[in-house]
Amino acid sequence: MTKIKEIKKVLQQEDADAAWITTPLNIFYFTGYRSEPHERLFALLIPSNEEPVLFCPKMEVEEVKQSPFKGKIIGYLDTENPFDKYSKTFSKMLIESEHLTVKRQRELTKAFNIEHYQDVDQSIKDLRNIKSEDEIINIKKAAALADKCIEIGKSFLKEGVEEREVVNHIENEIKKYGVNEMSFDTMVLFGDHAASPHGTPGDRKLQQNEFVLFDLGVVYHHYCSDMTRTIHFGTPNKEAQNIYNIVLKAETEAIKSIKPGVTIKDIDKIARDIIEEAGYGDYFPHRLGHGLGLEEHEYQDISSVNNNQLEAGMVITIEPGIYVPHVAGVRIEDDILVTENGYEILTQYEK
């Protein structure tokens, strides 16, 4: 319940009576219980001076009781109004404005006589930004399993194999290691198809002397990994190899700069300057990276407009890329833990 204590500190700082959390991943973050309730109400109420209250469909109550959550559980039937089961008045409520619908907010106002709302999204992002020891352990395991996925995929490469065949093989084989969920749709792209940064694997067949781009991640105990490797099948042409070398240098130098106190936009600049000086600046169309945790893309953006500083306990990706249509697409991505004195690279597959 340490994380709930942290959000209660936010309530005190903002002079608010309660927080209303409805994003399933944020509810999991604070309670240890995960659910996807679809259209049904699933919400965590955190009053400033009372125990937390979890609203959930009645059919999930026994599951909640088996979870780490310690607080009041309000289960309701589909024919019942869950707000009828809890009577309190809160003058000021913190809400996830990025997630809460207008309809739900009207219901809250009526149920709890709320006079004022304030956004809590950023406060939760700040909490999730710094990982606990347990979270780091899970992300490290997810990263190791992502390494295994690349190994599985590379060993399956052969002339004439289709992109989607490789995807299916990776996802089937990694299940043997206890993986039930990928972080996102696995991407395997051949040759200049990889010049589309978010291309969709299809029936393109692998030919000799092409690059193969793998972008994938694994979920382990709810935590994600996200890595990219670009591997040559045969001998790439001179321009493609040059592009690869530039991207590798950009990633290597950016990672070397990582430590607490470094301004995030400066890391992006290191990689971007290398790519621009090589003449490929127009072919690097995305940010350098992002946060990683319960979601494969989360706070913070590693970008040229982020003036925040790195802190120990953050887990981020570094993923420069160059995408030249009809020539080649190269991206290299690693998961990085910011440590007290520098960094630790969590994804270890060779480059």
From Swiss-Prot:
Judged by the first EC level, this protein's enzyme class is: hydrolase
GO MF terms, alphabetically ordered: hydrolase activity; metal ion binding
Superkingdom as given in the UniProt entry: Bacteria
Positions that bind Mn(2+) 1? D226, H290, E319, E333
Q: Which UniProt keywords apply?
A: Hydrolase, Manganese, Metal-binding
> So what family is this one in?
Belongs to the peptidase M24B family.
Name of the molecule in the record: Uncharacterized peptidase SERP1271
Q: Which organism is it from?
A: Staphylococcus epidermidis (strain ATCC 35984 / DSM 28319 / BCRC 17069 / CCUG 31568 / BM 3577 / RP62A)
